[in-house]
Amino acid sequence: MNALLSNPFKEGLRKRDTQIGLWLSSTTSYMAEIAATSGYDWLLIDGEHAPNTVQDLYHQLQAIAPYASQPVIRPIEGSKALIKQVLDIGAQTLLIPMVDTAEQARQVVSATRYPPLGQRGVGASVARAARWGRIDNYMAQANESLCLLVQVESKVALENLDAILEVEGIDGVFIGPADLSASLGYPDNAGHPEVQRIIESCIYRIRAAGKAAGFLAVDPAMAQKCLAWGANFVAVGVDTMLYTEALDSRLAMFKSVQSVSTAKRSY
């Protein structure tokens, strides 16, 4: 029988390693595999804002599997049924968006664990994650290898951050800069000094609680700031944004800049 593969991303968090990631929003296994050959420590497959179906997520997991980059899946929301599907297709690390309270965090923890630790539905014999029933003691191994990250991205979540950090089974907390800045009254302005102060404070509080702290920064200078503040899993770009920037830059070499978008982009 096959042994369940370890979760190198989770091991990296435990060792307090700095892990650099990339956001995948293109929804294709082809682009996912290209990214996986680039050497990023982790790749976030986005099911919240990118139009990914569960089958799309499945194909991207397959494309990334032969490489060292570790996949993280962000589902559209943290419902028990959807979490069950995403785990069954082989995800070992989840980023759950819009977690505002400790009770929500506890519900997500329960949805990701098999009984008696939680309420994850049992279907190992038809699940890629269990090699279709070929992994001995799969349920216990799955509970152990699961890495759960929750996303804090609202004023309410900030008020409840300490309580969320106390929830057992949460491995890390990810700060969502776009929604957070909008919730704080600074839409599309995560660089505002007040937002920056809050982000720095949150990273410190997360690390002080013994959890991993994550962030997405499409601006390299902001990514460096977050790393200096103590964030230890940071995504430094979005595939679709990098693609559009490269397209526009190449076109600008041959056509007047007036015909090419020069708008500053943010996630």
From Swiss-Prot:
InterPro entries, alphabetized: Aldolase/citrate-lyase_domain, HpcH-HpaI_aldolase, KDR_aldolase, Pyrv/PenolPyrv_kinase-like_dom, Pyrv_kinase-like_dom_sf
Annotated catalysed reactions: 2-dehydro-3-deoxy-L-rhamnonate = (S)-lactaldehyde + pyruvate
EC numbers, comma separated: 4.1.2.53
Positions contributing to substrate binding: Q151, A178, D179
Listed GO CC annotations: cytoplasm
Entry note: cofactor: Binds 1 Mg(2+) ion per subunit.
Active site, renumbered: H49
SUPFAM superfamilies reported for this sequence: Phosphoenolpyruvate/pyruvate domain
Superkingdom, natural source: Bacteria
Keywords in alphabetical order: Lyase, Magnesium, Metal-binding
The protein's required cofactors: Mg(2+)
Annotated site location: Increases basicity of active site His: D88
Assembly mode: Homohexamer.
Protein's name in the database: 2-keto-3-deoxy-L-rhamnonate aldolase
The species this protein was found in: Salmonella typhi
Gene: rhmA
